[in-house]
Amino acid sequence: MWLANQTRPDTANAVRAVARYANQPRELHWRTPIGVLEYVFSTSDFGITFQKGSGLELVAFADADYASKAADRRSVSGGAIMCAGACVCWFSRTQKCVTLSTTEAEYVALAHTIKEAMFLRYVWTFIFPGFGTMCITVFEDNEGAKNLAQNPVCTSNSKHIDVRHHFLRELIFKGEFVITHVESDDQHADVLTKPLDYTAFCYHRDFLMNI
């Protein structure tokens, strides 16, 4: 868990998936973490590398895997906050609510990511008092979620969404965050939400960790 949360974002999704069965594990749930450990051992020289002189600008990637949990059909949120060319904060977590569409799942993931980015911005302004309030770009590959976040009006398609997720609309209106569309192939938070083929996994891992 420490590796997944502190130094190896490339293991976060696998550790999250296995951790769900920690209470009543079976043989399969034992073999899987062994595979994760073998991967970590074989890539023990990998680590997060920051670029000197690249500034303190924060950018974020938000993604969701809709209804991926078979038992209760809950989706998975994934988010990564980048600074100085590499990931400084990331998460892979099962959403606490059951969402009714891919757009809604992505919207909830956006809210989770923006909360993490807000905290990091508070830390930055505490360490660097003259830093000021920056506008943080959040990259999202779902146009529906992007439009929903930028629309201050609740419609029949969004009025059921829990109000705690709508705070991001005010932040976008104030100009504190901007949601930018990114192609799915370049959605680097994908590695935090779902299993990927080897090529895609390495591409996103190398980007987040600046390998």
What are these regions (language model features)?
Residues 35, 61-70, 189, 193-194:
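Acidic, metal-ion-coordinating active-site neighborhood of RNase H-like domains
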Residues 42-46, 67, 87-89, 119, ...:
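Conserved helix-loop functional segments at active or binding sites
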Residues 1-46, 183, 192-193:
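C-terminal reverse transcriptase regions that engage the nucleic-acid substrate
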Residues 60-103:
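RNase H-like nuclease fold core
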Residues 6, 39, 82-84, 112, ...:
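Conserved catalytic core of Hanks-type protein kinase domains
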Residues 38-64, 129-132:
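Structured nucleic-acid-interacting core domains from mobile-element enzymes and related host factors
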Residues 21, 57, 75, 93-211:
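RNase H-like nuclease module associated with reverse transcription
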